[in-house]
Amino acid sequence: MSALRVSVDRIHPEGRCAMTEPQRRFGGGGERDARHLTALEEQLGAARTRLAQVSAQNDRLATTLREARDQIVALKAEVDRLGQPPAQFATFLEATGEGTADIVSAGRRMRVAVSPAIDLATLRPGQDVMVNEAMNVVAAFDYERTGELASVKEVLPDGRVLVLARADEERVVRLAGPLLDGPLRVGDSLTVDTRSGFAFERIPKAEVEELVLEEVPDIDYEDIGGLGPQIEAIRDAVELPFLHADLFREHGLRPPKGILLYGPPGCGKTLIAKAVANSLAKKAAELRGESQAKSYFLNIKGPELLNKYVGETERHIRLIFARAREKASGGTPVVVFFDEMESLFRTRGSGVSSDVETTIVPQLLSELDGVERLENVIVIGASNREDMIDPAILRPGRLDVKIKIERPDAESAGQIFAKYLTPDLPLHAEDVAVNGGTKQATVDAMIRATVERMYTETEENEFLEVTYAGGDKEVLYYKDFNSGAMIQNIVDRAKKMAIKDLLTLGQKGVRVDHLMSACVDEFKENEDLPNTTNPDDWARISGKKGERIVFIRTLMQGKKGTEAGRSIDTVANTGQYL
């Protein structure tokens, strides 16, 4: 390498070999010197190539060393990170001062420092935070999203609630940030972390939320037709004790705790219950001098209240009455309405596949006349099989008042028709002209004609022939199965026919012919309904009580002459409907 460097140094920078002193003196080296110069130039080129290769190799080596150094640094950082103690999560309680806060970690309450990078004003109770090995808060996160379910028993001041956890264990917990923004009520389901003592989230459950509908009904007594005596009886039972409580106390009378509305389906039991709540709200507002009426109508869907787990249905009933007492504590009337009451509170010991009623019935009895009195709470039950309800519920002191909702007679049917067939409806011009040109007279004539068509005991109105256990037979007419719901349906059918005539024929308005056709269609549609394995049970549901029915024959199909009337015999009683 040194010999190469010496040879390179002896070459002129311009690429020519410098001549030695003897060469200049004797006139040059000639051809031999030229060859020597060429050889030196070749050596120089080879040296430059080798130098470039060595330089490139040196660059690659330097790059490899840098990469190795970076990997070593990264590995060292990873080793240091793995060697650090674990960071802990805690629950924020409250800010205590400049840069400090109280937290709960693993059940321990501590006062720790907070990193300057975190704004204490943005932290809310119950929020998750991260602490380092020195137990300083270094990061903030969202709220806990899991926990045990607990039910609110009582709302306490200062952001606390009393909840019922598993096995009815009572516990006082704090409310986390999201729950502080909205009101809570008894019975709400919350997610609770028992370690930190916080409730984080309200969980909508399909328990009482779906079974209970809190509302102020918009149904008035004037909206109900054909039930004047029943409405008067229920107003005497409900409104008098509420409006004249001092007179009742003076005479030593207690208001009734409950009312049973019984009768065939579709005759207005639910409407009456809603009208009671509405009327009570108005009367209560008048007593207080308030302009806006307020009441609560808790509509209990009986069959959906049943639960396959032991004790759940009873707990729901307790929760319903607890909510009713809560709403009524301020003097606001509360109506608890049990629809289809026989599905929940049937006679104990009558169950076919279970004896769930043996515990549900006593639970209701304890709520009605237990230690806690029901103030401003009215229990109304509705049923079309009152014979299946446990007698202990129906005795005086519980459901004191029993009101039968009968099927409408001709006069009542006219009143019900007047609720749905009004002069403000579009009426056909010919019908109006026939009745003196006034809409009210036209409506009255339509109602009279329709009621006469429905209630006349003619052959075309014959519906069923029933045979009793004693051998007697009786012909039942369509009027014997009429109801307010059927009347509304007839009017709706007539209105649809009027709309179709307007679209197809261009003739606008309801006609009496539409009502007549609607009656025929409604009767025809109902001829297949008495189809049950037990005619006597079907007759009881439909409101026909008395001697046991063993045979039913429909008469409408047989009158047309195309096919015989359909017969229904009594078969072995399975206890269930098809």
Swiss-Prot record:
InterPro entries: AAA+_ATPase (IPR003593), AAA_ATPase_domain (IPR050168), ATPase_AAA_core (IPR003959), ATPase_AAA_CS (IPR003960), NA-bd_OB-fold (IPR012340), P-loop_NTPase (IPR027417), Prot_ATP_ID_OB_2nd (IPR032501), Prot_ATP_ID_OB_N (IPR041626). Residues 577-578 are annotated as: Docks into pockets in the proteasome alpha-ring. Gene3D superfamilies: 1.10.8.60, 1.20.5.170, Nucleic acid-binding proteins, P-loop containing nucleotide triphosphate hydrolases. Keywords: ATP-binding, Chaperone, Coiled coil, Nucleotide-binding, Proteasome. SMART domains: AAA. It comes from the Bacteria. Residues 35-84 form a coiled coil. GO terms for molecular function: ATP binding; ATP hydrolysis activity. It holds the Pfam family Prot_ATP_ID_OB_N. Pathway: Protein degradation; proteasomal Pup-dependent pathway. ATP binds at G266, C267, G268, K269, T270, L271. GO terms for cellular component: proteasome complex. GO terms for biological process: modification-dependent protein catabolic process; proteasomal protein catabolic process. Consists of three main regions, an N-terminal coiled-coil domain that binds to protein Pup and functions as a docking station, an interdomain involved in ARC hexamerization, and a C-terminal ATPase domain of the AAA type. Belongs to the AAA ATPase family. ATPase which is responsible for recognizing, binding, unfolding and translocation of pupylated proteins into the bacterial 20S proteasome core particle. May be essential for opening the gate of the 20S proteasome via an interaction with its C-terminus, thereby allowing substrate entry and access to the site of proteolysis. Thus, the C-termini of the proteasomal ATPase may function like a 'key in a lock' to induce gate opening and therefore regulate proteolysis. Homohexamer. Assembles into a hexameric ring structure that caps the 20S proteasome core. Strongly interacts with the prokaryotic ubiquitin-like protein Pup through a hydrophobic interface; the interacting region of ARC lies in its N-terminal coiled-coil domain. There is one Pup binding site per ARC hexamer ring. Upon ATP-binding, the C-terminus of ARC interacts with the alpha-rings of the proteasome core, possibly by binding to the intersubunit pockets. This is Proteasome-associated ATPase.
